[in-house]
Structure formats: structure tokens, C-alpha cells
Amino acid sequence: MHYSTSPLGEAGRTGEMQFIEMMQAGVLVSMSIDNVTAERCDCFACMHMLQTVNKHRTGGKFKLTTKKLVEMATIDGARDLGFDKVTGSLTPGKRADIILVRTRSPHMGSDGDAYDALVQLAQPSDVALVMVDGRILHRNGEFTALDYDKLLADGAQSVAALKAKAKWS
């Protein structure tokens, strides 16, 4: 059995997320983002929110490690979707799906624990590189594999067409 939690959306809508009980019962719990129009598309914030919700809900009785939170956002998500044979971990033979995160900034701290830094301190602006299947798609704040201006123009054109079709101004 699998369950994907969307912490940023669920925390504001449904009250208590009982994912700890699910994990204890053997359910594979992964992390997701439900709706990019209603919440931030920020995996770091999702991990941090899940950690915070867990601390408040369980009073710290169930320690959800930052390593486990990163696994929930990576390999557990791939397992949940049935993609774990091709992605979700850095393993020979799998696709090279990688993000590189800048750690040399004042807000990232200096204690040296990579999992703690990713979950508790990292922000989307810290992502220096995104590689999907070995192709660099984003580097230093710039998309490298798509025409961003064309994407925005196509999106605006689609919205205008939908509004016209719906007779909505």
C-alpha cells in the first residue's frame, strides 16, 4: 500500500496528517505537491513542513529523521510511482536525475549535515543545477533546455483561448 502526502496543501486543509501511523503499519509514504496553483512548488518547504507537523503532532515521540524526509521526497516517491528501477537514487544503471544545491551561503549554516541543511535550511534559489536523464535543464537560475519566453507566451495564449471559449473576461 502506498500513500503520497502533500504537506503544504494538507496542513492547511485537512488538519492532522496521520502519516506516522501509516508508516508504522508498513505503508510506503512519499511526498508530493498537490496543486501548483494553490501552493508553492517547493520540495524543500514540503520536507520542512512535514518535519514540523510531525514534531508538533507527536510531541517528538516519533523521530522523523531528515534523511528519511529526503528519502520520502526522492526514492520513496519513485517507488510510489513504480519508477524506482530507473530513478529516485544515484545508482549505476539508473537515469542521472540530479540536483546540485549550493551550501555556501549564510542561511545554509555550517554544521555539515547535508540532510539537515536540505530539510531545514535549503530554498529553491539554492538549486545550482538540475539534471534529468543526464541532460542539464537548469543551471544557475536559468533554464537551459527550453525557451522560457516562448513557454510564457504559449501559456498566456492558452489562458486567453480558454477564457474566450468560456466567455469569461
Locate each region found by the language model.
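A generic structural signal for short
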Residues: T5-L8, A78
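A cross-family glycoside hydrolase active-site/sugar-binding cleft signature
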Residues: H2-S6, S32-D34
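His/Asp/Glu-enriched, well-ordered alpha-helical/loop segment
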Residues: Q18-P106, L121-Q123
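Generic beta-structure capping elements
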Residues: Y3-S4, L50-T52, D133
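Helical hairpin unit composed of two closely spaced alpha helices linked by a short loop
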Residues: E10-R13
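Active-site microenvironment of metallo-dependent hydrolases
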Residues: E71-S169
